[in-house]
Amino acid sequence: KDQPEFELDPRFIVRNGDRTLYGGYYTQEELRSLVAYARERHVEIIPEIDMPGHTQAISAIYPQFTATGEASWGTIFSVPLSPAKEEVYTFLQHVLDEVMDIFPSRYIHIGADEVEKNTWRESAECRQLMDRLGFKTYEALQSHFVNRIHDYLQQKGREMICWDDAIEGGDYQVPGGKGALSPSADVMYWRYWVGGVPQRVVEQGHHIIFTPGDPMYVARPDGPLYDIYHYQGLDLIPDSLQHLVRGGQVSLWGESMSNFRRAD
């Protein structure tokens, strides 16, 4: 589900009324049962916990976690968490610890897409962090955030997946380049309207998973299955780098489904 809310039950989060959820949520016990049910059928469930964007459920309770103390909708997307506040990383590490305790999957998906950076630009704290790290762009600052989460997951013996927005910080292969996403992060390609993304992903050393919004998002009732079955993602990857292709994913977003029958 791509709505900015948590649908699991983190034990340490103090909920604030009904501002964070709609439509209910899964308890940890329910999720453990779901993981076991899937495992018995040789299916591994990989959780996605979005950050630093799509986090309105967090900022509704902890507005101090944003760069400006603002917990609202921005110009296009929700206001993201601040990459310059240590308490944000501490909080997210607690969340990820609980997620990893429930989901034994090798991979953890952290989102990292659709991050509106206006509040970062307004924040003296964010600008100071950029100066200290030698970054020239706010995309590099996003990569810094993602890399810190990536390193934490690796310390815990897990691998990280993120959306392709996270590659915009720079190229680690450029001498002296700063702000690049760690090459050991797996990247899901979804921004089909941005030219050259798949090739850039693999040229920066990442494994890639194809799930371009067109045609791989099946939320649209008019989406033709023919285009999914005949999608040729390998045509976008140089022959010498095709070993970095993990595979593909057809994406169905739960909030766009009104009932199970429509999902089926």
Regions found by a protein language model. Give the residues of each.
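Flexible, acidic glycine-rich loops studded with aromatic residues
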Residues: 162-167, 175-185, 192-264
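Short Asp/Glu-rich motifs
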Residues: 56-58, 172-173, 220-221
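Substrate-binding cleft of carbohydrate-active enzyme catalytic domains
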Residues: 1-161
